[in-house]
Every structure is written in C-alpha cells, then in structure tokens.
Amino acid sequence: LIFYSAVFGVLSRRGGHRCKEGESMNAALRRDADVILRSSLNAVLPDEAVRRALRDLRPGKGRVLLVAAGKAAWQMAHAAVETLGRVDGGVVVTKYGHVKGEIPGVTCYEAGHPVPDANGFAATQKALELVQGLTAGDTVLFLLSGGGSALFEQPLVPGAELQDITSQLLASGADIVEMNTIRKRLSGVKGGRFAQRCAPAQVFSIVLSDILGDPLDMIASGPAVPDTSTCAQALAVAERYHLALSAQARALLAQETPKTLDNVTTRITGSVRELCRAAASACRNLGYEPVLLTDQLCCEAREAGSFLGSIVRTQAGQGKKLAYIAGGETIVHLTGKGLGGRNQELALAAAPAIAGLNAAVFSVGSDGTDGPTDAAGGYVDGDTLAALEAGGWSGYAALQNNDSYHALKAVDGLIITGATGTNVNDVAVALIGEKTPPVSPEVSPEW
C-alpha cells in the first residue's frame, strides 16, 4: 500500500470518508489514514522551520560556511542557501537516496545509515577540512538532523570496528541515549568536538530533533553541544549490553568529552510534539475526536501495538469516530532473522485486538524509513488478521521472527513514502469508526 509519494501535496479534505458500495467497512479508515499521514508529515517538513530559525543569525564580518548532517540535511541546506542567498562553501552529508539536486556553493555527499560507512567518513573529513583555520569573524552554519550519528563521523577506532560496535548496539535493544553515549567517545566530531574544531569561529546550529525530550547533546550525538554524559555512564552501557570492545575502544570510553563550549548558538526546531499535534488536527478535520496519549512513547514496539489495540477494544461502541495518537520511538529486541522495523512491528502487534472491528492502527517513521526496509511503517485494520490467515500467515510467528515486513506486505499493509525530508521520530494512530459495536472486555485476543 503506497499511501503517498515522497513529494507531498497539502490536503484539506474535511468530514472523513464514507464506504463506497461493496467496500469493506474499513476502506474509509484506510483513506482517512492516508490523509492523516500526509497532513502530519507536511507539518514538520524542515524548510520553513530553517527559514524561521535563520532570522536569529547574526554572522560575523568574515566567511559564512555551511555544514549539514543527517537525514534531513539536504532539505535544510537547500532552505538555508535559498534564504541567505549564498554561502562561501559548504558540505552536506545525508543518507543514500536523499540528495535531490545541486545546491549552489555546497558539495553534497551520500553515506550509510544506520551503520556508518567509508563515504560518511570521507564526507566528514571534507567538512573538517572546510572549517580548518577559521577566524573569530567567520561563521559556521551547522544544520543537524536525526541520523547524524551514523552519517557524520570521524572514527577514533578503525572504521570496521566502529561499524561492528554500531551493529552490536542496534541489535542490543539499547535506546538512543545509551547508543549515543557510546558513540560520542569513539568519535572525533561527536560530543561537542566538531564545535571545538571550528573555533574560534562562531557556530550557529539549527537542530531538527528526533529524540524524545529534545536533549541537544544526544541529537546526532551532539557534535556542537557540550556533552552531559559521563565516562561512567558509557562504561555502564558497555557492561549492560555486553559489548565486545577492543582495548582501544574501552580506553576511549574512559576519556571525557567537552563539557563547555563558548562559540556555539543553538536553535532547536521541529519535534515529535509538533508531529503529534498535526496528526490530532488532521483527525479532527476528518470528524474524529482526537486524544493525544503521549509524545514520549519509548517501550517495546509490539507492546505499544498491543496497548493501542486494547484501547480500541475498550473504547469501541460509542457511536462516534475516535482517534488515539502516540508519538515517540519504540525499540525492538532482535531475536529472529526476518525483515521489518519498529513501526511495522507495532502495527502488526495490534492486529489481533482489533480483528473484526471497524478500526485501524498505523505507525510510521517521519523520515520515511523503518528499519532496513523500503517501508516507512505499517497499517492494520479489522480485516488484517483474517487476511493473514487466509494467506497462510501466522502473525504471531512473524513477530517472533521479527518478520513484520513480509507479513504486512502479504496483506497490503506496508506504508511506503520514500525519503520525506524530515526526521522527528514516529507517530502511531488508532482509529475507531462509528460502526464499531461494543466489545466484551472478557475477550481480548493477542499474540
């Protein structure tokens, strides 16, 4: 199911959709989901946010250089150069497939994510060469978005070892704060070290947040922010997840990062809170009564899906359209060998609870990427469980094998957007149609 293309149009449909003759009762919910996702993602595209933040820029009398890193780096850099008119040089490093064209005065690179690669190392080196030898009158415009931890990297251990440590962290179930606490100490640019390399030039940093609570030193591992994490915390993370580390890596974890920086001004723009509010507004425009459950969701993906499914069952039967919205970033502990992502797992886990109901649950990553797949997330409704069983699929077995991608693909439940140009965590929505009857609380199926 392709809900929308990578180029978004502004939608303003109101009142929701009604089922057409001969359609499943959930067909209208699927169309509503399309509108909600379009509207939500349009609201957090970085272009206008960058333009607003640049109103506070007071460049010195010297050169203005641009460095942008992350999944939204190209869009942020494009908006910045359009706004400023020109820059005296620049480097963009973003994920493969995310460069949309040339930007005057700026060299664009694509690199690996979520595991860093040689292209990212080379692009980061170009950025470091760009900011060498600056004066106090120069200004570095630093545009940062999620994904920068992998894309913007100068490893202090051999590149292959850094890739292995990153893969260990991704598979461990460590949250993003724990992961970045380790990454900072193995890098020549993270944890405030990039800003140190720019001194004495002033760094004006615009940050698109992809971490709950917007902790600046953790977004893309904080290349231009004093680090609040400690060596003791880094060593504790390594111990907690039994990371296999070389003696060199362990020694780096014991070295402190910069705790003060006097050459940086930071503006944060865009967050999961804005994404959730936009989803609520879109739901309201379609005739739903929206409830924002949280914008700090950070549990296991399948638990979040089961929770949303249980809300549907307990709130069904009110004779009106209801929407429950949760934003954040769930985690997945990899135990199987299948293919999927946290948003796909969340959606699939909700399927048994809403089976047979006029209801839907969908979850999407705002950057258009969910795990190592071409999908942004997943969609299920009251018809999904029956469709899986008719196709010979066990949803439970798919979850146990972390194979939500293939299960959802079999029932037309993948959400595919392509690169969206933004990155502000994930949003999950449960929709309850007005045709849903009351459900007995004693019957609550789950996998």
Role assignments for model-derived ranges:
Residues 25-65, 74-84, 114-136, 269-274, ...:
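N-terminal glycine-/serine-/threonine-rich phosphate-binding loop
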Residues 2-7, 11-24:
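Short, Lys/Arg-enriched N-terminal segments with co-localized hydrophobic residues
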Residues 67-69, 91-94, 141-146, 205-211, ...:
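Short beta-strand segments
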Residues 79-89, 103-108, 128, 132, ...:
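A glycine- and small-aliphatic-rich helix-loop capping segment at beta-alpha/alpha-beta transitions
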Residues 94-137, 178, 182-183:
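Glycine-rich oxoanion-binding loops at beta->alpha junctions
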